[in-house]
A protein has these predicted regions:
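Short S/T/G/P-rich N-terminal loop/turn motif that feeds into the first structured element of a domain
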Residues: 1-67, 74-90
Length: 90
């Protein structure tokens, strides 16, 4: 499994951000996303954690995915990173 973390700046309306992310989710799944979580990190910032099925697929498309997501959900990317998942516990 492969994970990406993306930091976003938005207008502060969490409900709208959540609805917009839900609306864009099918597009992310087309690129191999299998799971996404978002955490509000500040008054107008949040961080998403997305699990991807293919490291190669996400690495080849991450800039395009982030740009399209930002446009679709009305948020601006402020940072991010990608790595292999080291451990998953339930």
């Amino acid at each position: 499994m492969f994970v990406s973390f993306t930091d976003w700046e938005f207008d502060g309306n969490v409900e709208n951000a959540v609805e917009n992310m839900k609306g864009f989710w099918p597009e992310m799944k087309k690129h191999g996303a299998t799971n996404m979580r978002a955490t509000v990190t500040g008054e107008k910032t949040l961080r998403t954690m997305t699990i991807w099925s293919s490291e190669e697929q996400v690495k080849a498309n991450i800039d395009e995915i982030r740009a399209a997501a930002g446009k679709a959900v009305g948020m601006t990317t402020t940072g991010g990173m990608m790595r292999k998942v080291a451990v998953e516990l339930e």
